[in-house]
Regions:
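NAD(P)+-binding Rossmann beta1-loop-alpha1 motif at the extreme N-terminus of oxidoreductases
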Residues: 1-50, 54
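Acidic/polar active-site rim loop that often engages polyanionic ligands
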Residues: 25, 79, 140-150, 221-222, ...
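Rossmann-fold dinucleotide-binding core
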Residues: 111-178, 183-187
């Protein structure tokens, strides 16, 4: 099966790896510029090289996986894809435009899936000549087991079942979800991160204290502020804004501190600074401890 992954950023790279590590799948890793697509593939290769150096992966297996991934433009690589998994920027217009272009490129039997973490599948798929389904991976996509499979208003049962079957084939556990803002995981998880930011903003505790409390008191592997940095504070903000817009419920109001940090370009791990500063030696320091 040939899978077109649209978007060669962190999530797109992880999704490409999730398919390429299973024999029988090939991947077209696409972005809007050739160099961006190639950059995504190069980052995958660099990650694999580290695993080989640590003795966690065999070089022959890396070579097989990398040979299964082709990087380029969707116009050049997606015409014969059997499945498209879109992992573009979390913006309705971007996703609608992307799928509109793919609808003219891909063969009629190609399945269209979006990795959106919060947006309406029905709205993204409006105007397409084929159904759209949600196939929501979790970061890191090659290791996290869950895939939320989201049915929009016009998504046929057979499309949902096809995605559940593919998810199982790549070693994932699919959970079927009806369309709703944030689906299941992000409807619960992102407001928790948002509330942790309010607790910090109100001076209830410092960053390390909040994260330590949740790790030790709730048995969470990562504290909420650390997790927000890992996800990306821009993504957390975008999801909170969608939840608030879709529900009108004030409990989903984004914390002003997160909005301020995003405006300042402090998005977390990917920019080197969020609630923590990420040092070259892979340690991190809470920004309020400096």
């Amino acid at each position: 099966m040939k899978v077109g992954v649209i978007g060669a950023g962190t999530m797109g790279q992880g999704i490409a790896k999730a398919f390429a590590q299973i024999e029988g799948f090939t991947v077209a890793l696409c972005d809007i510029k050739q160099e961006w697509a190639e950059g995504g593939k190069n980052k995958i290769a660099a990650g694999y090289a580290k695993l080989v150096a640590k003795g966690k992966l065999d070089q022959a297996e890396v070579d097989r996986r990398m040979a299964a991934i082709t990087a380029g433009l969707k116009e050049d690589l997606c015409a014969d894809c059997d499945l498209i998994v879109e992992a573009a920027f979390e913006d309705m217009k971007v996703k609608q435009t992307t799928f509109g272009e793919l609808d003219k490129i891909c063969k009629p039997e190609c399945i269209f899936a979006s990795n959106t973490s919060s947006l309406s599948i029905t709205e993204i798929g409006k105007g397409l000549t084929r159904p759209l389904v949600g196939m929501h991976f979790f970061n890191p996509a090659d290791r996290m087991k869950l895939i939320e499979v989201i049915a929009g208003v016009n998504t046929p049962a057979e499309t949902v079942e096809a995605i559940k079957k593919i998810s199982t084939e790549i070693g994932k556990s699919p959970v079927q979800v009806n369309e709703a803002a944030g689906f299941v995981v992000n409807r619960i998880l992102i407001p928790m991160i948002n509330e942790a930011a309010f607790i910090k903003m109100e001076g209830v505790s410092d960053i390390a204290g909040i994260d330590t409390a949740m790790k030790l008191g709730a048995n969470h592997p990562m504290g909420p502020l650390e997790l927000g940095d890992f996800i990306g504070l821009d993504i957390c903000l975008a999801i909170m804004d969608v939840l608030y817009k879709e529900t009108g419920d004030s409990k989903y109001r984004a914390c002003p501190l997160i909005r301020k940090m995003v405006r300042g370009g402090n998005l977390g791990c990917k920019t080197g600074k969020g609630f923590y500063i990420y040092n070259a030696d892979r340690t991190k320091t809470p920004v309020d401890a400096l």
